[in-house]
């Protein structure tokens, strides 16, 4: 029996095991007290990266089994229906919205609430949420702060990429931007003529520096920085980490330029096998008393998503560190930021996270999804019927573990009335 999941289907489908992580996965990384030596193009002995490259190959081999199904609209549709059926949180979002008076209850909302409930941050009353629209993180923090922490106020600023074309819609599905314009740092393309125009693109070094400046001018201190950025890679999931390197570097750098001492950080990542990603984690380890790689239970186990969490920032950048990192973003290359041979103990902990989250949990869930596809291709209703009782048990358990309470009307975020619905 799997260490992660169990379910007894009975009869001809007694093999059926729901994919439900029993625990919030959290792997701690050691703080680095030695001096930080940033390099423009650090070299790394191949032996250090060998097991990470092997992990990448093993995971991609399993992902590749789904690739042929993505080529035909009919099989692609069926695959996503199957994966939706084995999503243990499907339906929970509506329950949370209506039972607890919650807002913008997306999957991002569930993940952020779970992170806040599990990580025991010292203060989250003032937050900068980057790469944020449609607003699930802000809404979850607002709900948590008022119902669990009982802060008298919640102050926030946020940013997201503003589309360059007037014909492209801003992802403001719930009206959080429209109804709270003073809380947002990015600007419409209509303001391009302004000297300090910033569209929220964190892959541009000048934007990053300017966003951090705007954030700290409007909100001081910043107790919590979050960033949930990710580029749509289409069907090319094997290159998801590589294609997001610059974006994830930019969103991390924005946070490190704006987060106050004593503050906490939550950053979205995917796999953690590329030398540049590993070096970025090494950089984080110099700034936070506690550093973790996490996988919330509400983060779908079929995907490679991870969240890096830093608790209690110990120091700010030196002018030289800021200069080197901004220059690297401006003239980006994906060589390591530091000499990885100086961080072998930390890299052992990162690899344990890779094994736990990707080589065990994700691969097992992907294999489970493919088995369900083969057995339930034309029997999706039957699959849903099998899983429905277990989903209810698990969702009820999640609500108890994460201590949900009703949000008072006076503490709700201001949203545009026409777009306050939730994602099922």
Swiss-Prot record:
Q: What keywords tag this UniProt record?
A: Early protein, Methyltransferase, S-adenosyl-L-methionine, Transferase, Virion
Q: Where are the transmembrane segments?
A: none
Q: Where in the cell is it found?
A: Virion
A cellular component term from Gene Ontology for this protein is: virion component
Give residues annotated as binding S-adenosyl-L-methionine: 135, 228
Q: EC number(s) of the enzyme?
A: 2.1.1.-
Q: Which Pfam families did the record assign?
A: FtsJ
Report the induction information.
Expressed in the early phase of the viral replicative cycle.
Query: Does the entry feature the keyword Acetylation, yes or no?
Result: no
Any one GO MF annotation of this record? mRNA (nucleoside-2'-O-)-methyltransferase activity
Catalytic residues (positions): 268 (proton acceptor)
Domain of life the protein comes from: Viruses
Annotated signal sequence range:
none
Some GO term, biological process aspect, for this entry: which one?
7-methylguanosine mRNA capping
Adrift-type SAM-dependent 2'-O-MTase domain span: 103-315
Report the protein name in the record: Probable methyltransferase EP424R
In which organism is this protein found? African swine fever virus (isolate Tick/South Africa/Pretoriuskop Pr4/1996) (ASFV)
């Amino acid at each position: 029996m799997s260490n992660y999941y169990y379910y007894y289907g009975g009869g001809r489908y007694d093999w059926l095991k729901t994919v439900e992580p029993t625990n919030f996965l959290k792997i701690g990384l050691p703080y680095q007290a030695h001096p930080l030596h940033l390099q423009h193009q650090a070299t790394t002995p191949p032996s250090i990266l060998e097991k990470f490259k092997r992990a990448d190959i093993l995971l991609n081999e399993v992902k590749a089994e789904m690739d042929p199904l993505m080529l035909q609209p009919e099989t692609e549709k069926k695959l996503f229906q199957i994966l939706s059926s084995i999503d243990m949180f499907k339906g929970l979002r509506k329950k949370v919205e209506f039972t607890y008076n919650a807002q913008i209850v997306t999957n991002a909302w569930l993940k952020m609430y779970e992170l806040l409930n599990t990580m025991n941050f010292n203060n989250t009353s003032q937050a900068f949420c980057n790469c944020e629209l449609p607003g699930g993180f802000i809404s979850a923090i607002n709900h948590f702060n008022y119902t669990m922490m009982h802060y008298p106020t919640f102050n926030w600023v946020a940013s997201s990429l503003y589309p360059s074309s007037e014909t492209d819609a801003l992802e403001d599905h719930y009206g959080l931007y429209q109804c709270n314009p003073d809380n947002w740092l990015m600007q419409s393309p209509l303001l391009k003529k302004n000297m300090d125009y910033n569209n929220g693109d964190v892959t541009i070094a000048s934007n990053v520096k300017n966003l951090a400046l705007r954030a700290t001018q409007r909100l001081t201190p910043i107790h919590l920085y979050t960033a949930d950025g990710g580029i749509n890679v289409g069907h090319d999931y094997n290159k998801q980490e590589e294609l997001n390197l610059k974006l994830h570097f930019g969103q991390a750098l924005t946070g490190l330029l704006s987060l106050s001492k004593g503050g906490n950080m939550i950053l979205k990542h995917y796999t953690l096998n590329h030398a540049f990603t590993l070096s970025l984690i090494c950089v984080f380890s110099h700034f936070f008393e506690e550093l973790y790689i996490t996988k919330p239970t509400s983060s779908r186990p079929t995907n490679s998503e991870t969240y890096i969490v830093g608790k209690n920032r110990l120091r700010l950048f030196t002018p030289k560190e800021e200069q080197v990192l901004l220059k690297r973003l401006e003239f980006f290359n994906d060589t390591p930021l530091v000499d990885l041979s100086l961080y072998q103990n930390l890299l052992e902990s990162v690899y344990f996270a890779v094994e736990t989250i990707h080589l065990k949990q994700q691969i097992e869930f992907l294999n489970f999804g493919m088995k369900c596809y083969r057995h339930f291709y034309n029997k999706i209703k039957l699959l849903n019927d099998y899983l429905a009782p277990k989903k209810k048990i698990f969702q009820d358990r999640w609500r108890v573990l994460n201590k949900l309470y009703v949000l008072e009307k006076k503490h709700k975020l201001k949203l545009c009335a026409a777009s306050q619905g939730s994602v099922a």
